[in-house]
Amino acid sequence: MLFRRILPIPMTLLVLGLAAAAAEAAPVSRSGNLVGADGTTLGKVTVTEAPHGVLLRLSVEGLMPGWHGLHFHEKADCEAPGFKSAGSHVHAATPVVHGLMNPEANDDGDLPNLYVGADGTAMVELYSTLVSMQGAGGRPALLDADGSAVVIHANPDDYMSQPIGGAGDRVACAPIK
């Protein structure tokens, strides 16, 4: 009889311990709605911590077809219409030198261009080793005190020219906080 009363206690503790361990093992992930210059929701962004960077998943509709620059910006502030409130690209060094193909680059917010199909939609998963969610490996943290944003630009990034590779206006923004 005593055995039946005592056995549930260790089993309960084991289950609680396993649940806590599983919760600790889950990677840090944040999502945000992509909004257009008129404030309408165009899609969704999810950024998830990975062992050596972050995985970005993005789905969007309502954009002009073609290539668009895509960057992590330094503030989770997507005030329309121009999204200038999102600040500059995420960076750890100054002065910031832009360009994924630039051998002198130190711009941690750089990402590959996004291709939008003829129907105005795009879905993509991208991996960046330049940033982290919380500062792992000394990389800039997307979840710092003021968060960050994923910004889509009107034009493609040429990966070389300063300051933003000719990517032009900001046409969509998603806060990450």
Model-predicted segments: where are they?
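N-terminal leader/targeting pre-sequences
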Residues: 21-177
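Bacterial N-terminal signal peptides that target proteins for export
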Residues: 1-11
